[in-house]
Each structure stands twice: as structure tokens, then as C-alpha cells.
Amino acid sequence: MDVEIRSEGEDQKPKIIGYSALFDSFSEDLGGFKEVIRRGAFTQAVKDDDIRALFNHDPNYVLGRNKSGTLKVEEDDKGLRIEIDPPDTQWANDLIKSMQRGDINQMSFGFRTKKDNWYDKDGETIRELLDVSLFDVSPVTYPAYQATEANVRSVKQVFEDYKTANDIQENALAEGKRKQAQVSLLLKELDLLEKEL
């Protein structure tokens, strides 16, 4: 199981424990590119950001918050480890039951990129996440990183939930960088072809 439910302490309250992101694991195709998260991408966010634990990235379903002590977030050698003390509410209890059955067993995170790197590998465009701001960590139904143990984020939800004017501008800049990298590679290939002739 990718995410576990543990009952700890005298009151045996359940905790949601897992990895919201794994380092060096590639996402599914995110619309012309894949992402990979590098070690250190969360270092500053874990120290500074006000992070919520949400269900499916939905701000109507808050499971915990690091500033209130109901969410613990740490970056270790494996990835972004989380521990949530969920509220004793009907919807949270229903979620826990679904997780115990194995219906929901993957995680994700909502973020804004502070530093990234684009490159091509084996004909695929890759985006390395080097430094990010965190909004949320979430148990999710549909993650983007199918091959990872914890799976990182729900593609559809992140794009729908976090399209602010700033995000759109950052995405446009990232797309420009990706296209610039593609043009640069094509120019290098053209230069090599010219030298061969």
C-alpha cells in the first residue's frame, strides 16, 4: 500500500502516513513533457510554506495543516514524507474507510515552480523540478506519477485548481523555455549535419 492508515496513541486515532512525492521518478505525460522531482526541491518549502493536507486537492476538504500541527511534512532521502492527523468528521472518516479498503492509496502535491530545468532525453521533453513552493499534499484518486510509490499529483486537479494569473505567466515562461530548448537542439543537429556534408 502506498499510503497507510495507522492508529496510534491511547485514543487510537487514525493517521494518514505516506509519501506525497518521490525523488527521481518520472511522471506520466503532462501534455508534451514529463516531470521529475530532484532532491532538495522541497527543502525551503518545508521550512517556510503554510501547507494544507487536502483530499483530491479540494480546499473544501481540509485534512490538516502544518501551521496548526495537524500535518507533518519532511523531506528525506526518498521524497516528501507526510503524516496527517485527520479531523473526526464524517467525510474524513469515509475517506479513511476508502483508504483502508485500498480504493484510494496514492498521494500528490500542489505547487508553484520556483526553479526548474528543461532538457530532451530519448526524444522526450523533461522538466526537472529543482525548487518549489508547496500549497498542499493530498491523498488522490488519479495521480500523475503512476510508477512511483506515493505518486505525486493529479494532473487535472492541479491545472484546474491553481490557474491564477501568476501560474499562467509562469507556465508561458516554462513553455517558452521548452520551445527554446527544442530549437537549440534542432540548431545543434542542423550544425552537425552541415559539418557532415
Where are these regions (language model features)?
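Residue microenvironments linked to proteolytic maturation
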Residues: 6-9, 15-17, 52, 70-170
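Short conserved beta-strand and strand-loop elements enriched in small hydrophobics
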Residues: 49-61, 107
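Polar/acidic, low-complexity leader/linker segments enriched in S/T/G and N/D
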Residues: 1-48, 161, 170, 180, ...
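Flexible loop/turn segments at secondary-structure boundaries
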Residues: 25-27, 60-62, 116-118
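Charged/polar low-complexity intrinsically disordered segments, enriched in acidic residues
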Residues: 154-197
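Short helix/loop capping segments that flank catalytic or ligand/cofactor-binding pockets
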Residues: 26-29, 63-64, 145-148
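A surface-exposed loop-and-adjacent beta-strand signature within N-terminal beta-sandwich domains
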Residues: 58-68, 75
